[in-house]
Amino acid sequence: LTSSQTTNQIFVMLEAIARKQREKVLTLYYDLIELKESPFGILALLVRQCNQLLQVKDLDCLGKSNGMIAKQMKVPAFVAGKLKDQAKMFSMDTLRDMIEACAKTDESIKTGKISDRVGVELLLIQFSQK
């Protein structure tokens, strides 16, 4: 699996999280694991994606156009548009809470309190609960 395919899977996963589609979220996660993607790598991409969504939401609130958002974030305009659409599915508080939960999971994994695979799985279950 290429890096861009993995990033795309994370994008799809966040969409499923926003729609509270737990089965789809977990299927995407298990598929990534099956393809030898590390849970830690998945966690890092989740954090990156949430941070991007937060940044887009912030710029959108300031009335920035897709072109300006793309330029400021150093991404192609179509990516900025996709991020903007996805950002509408989350509140700022939800995104902040998700980033914080990712940080706590990261710490629990690094301190040996939980395995990386289970830690990320529990996080995804938490994010996608109704």
State where each predicted segment sits.
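Helix-rich C-terminal "collar"/helical-bundle subdomain used as an assembly and partner-interaction module
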Residues: 21-130
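Long, charge-dense, solvent-exposed interaction surfaces that engage phosphate-rich ligands
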Residues: 1-12, 16-19, 34
